[in-house]
UniProtKB/Swiss-Prot annotation:
GO terms for molecular function: oxidoreductase activity. Keywords: Antenna complex, Phycobilisome. An enzyme involved in the biosynthesis of bilin. GO terms for cellular component: phycobilisome. InterPro entries: ARM-like, ARM-type_fold, PBS_lyase_HEAT. Pfam families: HEAT_2 (PF13646). The lineage of its organism: Bacteria, Bacillati, Cyanobacteriota, Cyanophyceae, Synechococcales. Belongs to the CpcE/RpcE/PecE family. It comes from Synechococcus sp. (strain WH8020). PANTHER family: DEOXYHYPUSINE HYDROXYLASE, PBS LYASE HEAT-LIKE PROTEIN. This is Bilin biosynthesis protein MpeU.
Amino acid sequence: MTGINSQQEDIKIETLTQEEALELATALKQKLSHGELPNSDLESINKMVAGLGDNRGELRLTFAKSLGSIGEDAIPILCEALKNSSNVVIRRASAKTLNIIGNKKALPNLIEAFESDEDPVVQGSSAGAMATIGEPAIEPLLRILTESNCTAFQIGLINLALGFIGSKGPMGFNSAISSKNPEIRIAALNALAEQAQKSENKDVQALILNALKDQDSEVRAEAAIIVGKSMDQEEGAHQLHELLKDKNDQVRKNAALSLMKMEAVISIDFLDRAIRQESDEQVKGVMIVARNQLMKH
């Protein structure tokens, strides 16, 4: 972060005329087609970043691909543009180009843009770039998620990013699952949910099943839903049976719904017993529906 900031002091984003942008893009496109790398000196990179503000989408794509092929050397100028350019098109394209590069050196600047830039496309592209960076982005994304000023739009973007990261390296969420903050634990579970549905990764399943015993009822309730969506009766039914006796109404309800979802016919007797002991009429109604549905199988 320090290295990028120190370099940014000498960076000044140029501007290109329509003719200059077209001429440069044509030359860059030819280099790319021949498998050649563009010049990576400061002046050349500066001109390419300036080209990201062109109103012609095809030209912007050529500049982005060229900067992406340069890689790490382009990060300082792209980060400067992302932070300080008054041209929203350049900020958007800079975030998208940092996504192409996918280097964690850009992470502090992407976090800042995600939190402070008011443009939704910049926020979305910054989140996408963090998702591409992967595991190093998990902690800052979860931190933002727990802040009171995190918007509903940002929450959606973060959940998408975390889900993508989870699909690539689910065990990177180990520390998040053990966080002291229940909101972070829930976010980590949701990020693992899709991965659990797509594969039979025993380590991922173990993390989710262990969350059924979490001290926070909201975490247990969320884990119960995920188990129902991602596991069969042999893998998760017995653990859900314990939650039919949970002290929290929502947890008991979710456990019954998940047993129905996984078609756990081995759970009919457990649901019968839970129905007889249930004092909440709404929860009892859900349990009865779940039992009756299972009896049809």
